[in-house]
Amino acid sequence: DQIQWAEKEYNNSKFNLPSPFNKVISQLPEWVSKPYEEIAENFLKDLGIFDTHVALITAFGLSVLDKNESVDRCRTLPSHYTLTHYLSGKDPDVFYHPAKDLLSIVNPDLDEWASAKSLYINEGDVIIHPSYLEYSTPQVERRRVTITLLFNIERIPA
């Protein structure tokens, strides 16, 4: 399954990459990528654009964070969307409000716009978010393994 594949990739490359482990995968077995293709198709259906658009996967990555490791604020541009599959570990990412600073200038006392939020996640959860959204991963309490897929939505030529 995907967890065994991820552990094998990690064990084969962990001494060749800096910590925290983040590897771009160029050759992916079809059985690993197929579920993500289906999720991307369902995302297009949810948006109501499945008949006119296609999701083009532009990058695929594997991240392994060991206890007390973290990831600084980042975003995954220039892709349109980022899909994260939490294979193991329950430590969530923190997502930052893209216009918080601007809103604070206009109305500094407005508390309803939090600058950052995290989602409650379980192992196996998949989330999709716009790639312009900054996120980080605070120190994890135990090993966390995620697969990240970047994709663009393109109109199907008529």
What are the residue ranges of the model-derived segments?
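Residue-level preference for beta-strand/loop junctions
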Residues: 56, 77-79, 143
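Asparagine-centered strand-capping/turn motif at beta-strand->loop junctions
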Residues: 135, 139-141
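A short coil-to-beta-strand element that immediately follows conserved catalytic motifs
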Residues: 48-60, 95
